[in-house]
Each structure stands twice: as structure tokens, then as C-alpha cells.
Regions:
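Positively charged n-region of N-terminal signal peptides that target proteins for export
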Residues: 1-5
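Bacterial N-terminal signal peptides
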Residues: 6-16
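Pepsin/retropepsin-fold aspartyl endopeptidases
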Residues: 19-164
Length: 164
């Protein structure tokens, strides 16, 4: 009986010390699109509500009487400096109305799986041509609420380790 009490006491008093500490992310991190295993740069941006993915050649199509989009994700190969294009096709979840300099723009929003650190997140991304930006992804507040705190003084703190 005493051994049992000691075990319970040990479990209650010491477990927080061994609990996983919450991750603090840098303002720029590497991320992976899964299951395609495409490595991207992501900027964690608390000023954006919906996450945004750099998408090129966006084409709206109909598939099984539903709205879909085909698009390319462009990544610069760090070894060669050449562009690599990865084709994607996803159903449109909704349209996002965004204010731009000359009015409004409607962007398709798709769901994608993104690996941050060792965890896989199923998130929504508005598709937009972000050519010329260093980060292919902006992670907005809807995604950041799942990730945790952002330290604006840090970058590249936790590489993605999810396996395809």
C-alpha cells in the first residue's frame, strides 16, 4: 500500500518536470507540405488571419460537380538556384475576399497538410501569387493558434521532421 501511494505521489509531483515544453517558433521557419514532402520557407505572421500559400498558374476546374483548383508550388533549389515546380490539385473550401490596391480580389482557399517541427497540421491556405517574396507561405493567426508562441528575434528554430 505504501509503495502504491509513493508511486502516485511521485507521478503527481514530478510529471510537470517531464512534460513536453511548449514550442516557441521563430518568425521564419521551414515547413513541409505533406504527403508530397515539399520543403518550403514559412513566415509566421500574426498580422494575417488566414494563411497564404504562394501558388502559380492557378486554374479553376470542376471535378465531380465540385469546384477544384490546379496550381503549382515553386521552390528554389538551394543547391542549384533553379526553380522546381510541384503540381497540386485540391478542392476549393471557400473563397477569400481580400482588399488590394485597386479594390478587392477573390482567392481560392484549399486545405493542405503542413509539417512544422514533428507535428502535422491540417490547415487552410488562400492561394496567391507571392512571386518575389522570400517565404512561400505566410502562416496566419488561424494556424498560429495551433502552433504556439512566436519569438520575433529567432528564425529557423525547429526543422520539420514528419515522414511521408
Amino acid at each position: 500500500m505504501n509503495l502504491r501511494r509513493a508511486g502516485l505521489l511521485l507521478a503527481f509531483c514530478c510529471s510537470p518536470a517531464f512534460a513536453a515544453q511548449p514550442v516557441t517558433w521563430g518568425w521564419v521557419e521551414q515547413a513541409k507540405l505533406m504527403p508530397e514532402n515539399v520543403l518550403l520557407m514559412a513566415r509566421l505572421d500574426t498580422g494575417v488571419q488566414t494563411s497564404v500559400m504562394d501558388a502559380r498558374n492557378v486554374v479553376k476546374i470542376r471535378k465531380n460537380d465540385q469546384r477544384w483548383v490546379q496550381y503549382d508550388i515553386v521552390v528554389i533549389d538551394p543547391a542549384t538556384g533553379k526553380e522546381q515546380r510541384f503540381p497540386f490539385e485540391r478542392p476549393v473550401e471557400r473563397q477569400l475576399k481580400v482588399r488590394v490596391a485597386d479594390g478587392f480580389e477573390h482567392r481560392p482557399v484549399v486545405s493542405m497538410d503542413i509539417c512544422m517541427g514533428e507535428k502535422l497540421y491540417h490547415e487552410q491556405f488562400a492561394l496567391s501569387d507571392r512571386q518575389g517574396d522570400d517565404a512561400q507561405v505566410l502562416l496566419g493567426r488561424r494556424t498560429l493558434e495551433h502552433l504556439g508562441a512566436v519569438d520575433a528575434s529567432k528564425t529557423l528554430t525547429t526543422p520539420p521532421t514528419c515522414k511521408p
